[in-house]
Amino acid sequence: ISYDDFERKMRVGNLQDIWKGAQFIHQSVLISRKYQIEHLYNVENKISADFEFFYHSIMSGAKIYKLDKSIAVFKSGGISDTKRLRAMLSNMKVVMSKDFSIFKFFYHGSKMFNELIKIIIKFFLPKKIISFFQKINLR
């Protein structure tokens, strides 16, 4: 992931934890044309159609191969970065619509609460301090 003044490598997480949120960067996924045509993105889901596609694919047992190689570099600042709370809520709706549980509901709720606190703190801190902590936290 390319940030303004540093880069970060991200490894694929545990696919069984997809209910917690994306376990990989969608730009790094290669999908067979046939599978993609048979399983289109939900264009009504404006914020997390990619997450919805991968969530349903993983939960339905689609064949997935993990490569231990970097195959994509992308710049931060997409919708899931700039509209983080909305993206988190949208992901939660995807999970809850198919697999509701109180535990998962509170898990997502606590993640969104933490994100709200971060947004409030970032509002008051100078950009240099925010950037400093991002470098420490994301490396």
Regions found by a protein language model. Name each.
Residues I1, N42, K46, D68-K69, ...:
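Short, structured coil/loop segments at alpha-helix boundaries
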Residues Y3-S90:
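Conserved nucleotide-sugar donor-binding catalytic segment
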Residues S97-R139:
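Membrane-proximal basic amphipathic "stem/tether" segments
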